[in-house]
């Protein structure tokens, strides 16, 4: 038997995917997230991101609505965000 190369995904591409990002309270956090996402999804605009502080004010949460074409693009965005120094968690 041959191994099936196509993996089954629960996400239908292309789509607009909501990325949840948690990170440090920092004046550059929102712009850093936006710039990082734009490396892999250049059409992402400032109005695609919303931020809010955590309940205790220790972290900032951001949701970015990103148009992604395939799983590889989404994976690259996740990797870029998780490697950023201001980002703690990406969901």
UniProtKB/Swiss-Prot annotation:
Coiled coil: none
Gene3D superfamilies (alphabetical): 3.30.70.260
A Pfam entry, by short name: DUF493
Protein family: Belongs to the UPF0250 family.
Name this protein carries in UniProt: UPF0250 protein NMB1218
Taxonomic lineage: Bacteria, Pseudomonadati, Pseudomonadota, Betaproteobacteria, Neisseriales
